[in-house]
UniProtKB/Swiss-Prot annotation:
PANTHER family: 40S RIBOSOMAL PROTEIN S14/30S RIBOSOMAL PROTEIN S11. The gene is rps-14. GO terms for biological process: ribosomal small subunit assembly; translation. Keywords: Cytoplasm, Ribonucleoprotein, Ribosomal protein. Its main location: cytoplasm. It comes from the Eukaryota. This is Small ribosomal subunit protein uS11. Residues 126-150 are annotated as: Disordered. It comes from Neurospora crassa (strain ATCC 24698 / 74-OR23-1A / CBS 708.71 / DSM 1257 / FGSC 987). PROSITE patterns: RIBOSOMAL_S11 (PS00054).
Length: 150
């Protein structure tokens, strides 16, 4: 008599994201760092401890001069939004950051397009906040006593 085959247990669905009810929003935090050299789109959970996904504009394009372009930022944001949907995150709070400190306090060209790409890809937008670091009193700015001469 041949040996009996062990009964296979029914396969369970394993979800990576949080357990939620239908129609409930699950928030994450999208931190967009837009300098004039590159754009970072970094999504974490609400506490900021666990990174869900991080994509950089320089990864999405080949030419160095295009790293900070709005197009590269848009591609990065679309990738991040797709990954968030896989994990069950449906809404994002946005924190936009420029270089700050002794650098410029104006976000680079990729900030606006990254935000628009997140919104157009179906993510609900919660709060939008500017978290550029501003010095209360810092080290001396470059340029010398008479400033930058053009």
């Amino acid at each position: 008599m041949p040996p009996k085959k062990a009964a296979r247990p029914a396969q369970e669905n394993i979800s990576l994201g949080p357990q939620i009810r239908e129609g409930e929003l699950v928030f994450g935090v999208a931190r967009i760092f837009a300098s004039f050299n590159d754009t970072f789109v970094h999504v974490t959970d609400l506490s900021g401890r666990e990174t869900t996904d991080r994509v950089i504009g320089g990864i999405k394009v080949k030419a160095d001069r295009d790293e900070s372009s709005p197009y590269a930022a848009m591609l990065a944001a679309q990738d991040v939004a797709a990954r968030c949907k896989e994990l069950g995150i449906t809404a994002l709070h946005i924190k936009i950051r420029a270089t700050g400190g002794n650098g410029t306090r104006t976000p680079g060209p990729g900030a606006q397009s990254a935000l628009r790409a997140l919104a157009r890809s179906g993510m609900k937008i919660g709060r939008i906040e500017d978290v550029t670091p501003t010095p209360s009193d810092s080290t001396r700015r470059k340029g010398g006593r008479r400033g930058r001469r053009l």
